[in-house]
């Protein structure tokens, strides 16, 4: 169970300030299904909206884990990332996790060039090297730390490349 939660955390909860938005120009949405033991337990959707140099990515996800007929973990979230060119300028989310309300309100401070974060687990500043933990952006794999899109907390990470695989859809 711990391994499942850890993998789910890495998959669901891991956007660097320079997001290479051009890599995502052809996408209007990304839809992911979440499975556990071969059973569909939820979804994770990203919607891309563009207006000139501004891009807004909306994220919605919901899943629950049941064990012996009892729900042991449940989460539902809505988030919005806003970019001007490749620069993340804001991120806001609201989450209900096991009946507890969580949130993140992040803004780029133009004077300090750092993120001002007000979250349910963290209030303070973060450098723009941090990544919002959402999986549409491949930069999550290169970042040394991430900002939780659920609570705003900052988590150090080490990602080790172990191989390359082509997946045909």
What are the roles of these predicted feature ranges?
Residues 4-13:
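Sec-dependent N-terminal signal peptides
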Residues 17-78, 91-100, 152-169:
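N-terminal cleavable signal peptides for secretion/export
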Residues 25-27, 92-169:
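Solvent-exposed helix/loop surface patches that form functional interfaces
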Residues 47-52, 83-85, 108:
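Short, low-complexity Ser/Thr-rich regulatory SLiMs
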Residues 53-56, 88-89, 112-116:
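Hydrophobic residues embedded in beta-strands of well-ordered beta-sheets
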Residues 76-86:
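Short hydrophobic interaction/assembly module
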């Amino acid at each position: 169970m711990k391994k499942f939660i850890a993998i789910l955390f890495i998959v669901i909860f891991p956007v660097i300030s320079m997001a290479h938005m051009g890599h995502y120009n052809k996408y209007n949405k990304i839809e992911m299904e979440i499975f556990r033991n071969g059973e569909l337990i939820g979804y994770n959707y990203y919607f891309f909206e563009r207006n000139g140099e501004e891009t807004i990515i909306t994220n919605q996800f919901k899943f629950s884990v049941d064990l012996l007929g009892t729900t042991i973990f449940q989460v539902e979230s809505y988030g919005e990332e806003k970019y001007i060119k490749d620069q993340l300028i804001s991120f806001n989310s609201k989450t209900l996790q096991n009946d507890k309300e969580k949130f993140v309100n992040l803004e780029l401070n133009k004077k300090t060039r750092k993120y001002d974060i007000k979250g349910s687990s963290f209030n303070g500043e973060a450098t723009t090297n941090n990544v919002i933990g959402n999986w549409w952006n491949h930069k999550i794999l290169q970042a040394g730390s991430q900002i939780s899109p659920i609570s705003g907390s900052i988590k150090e990470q080490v990602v080790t490349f172990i191989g390359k695989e082509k997946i045909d859809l």
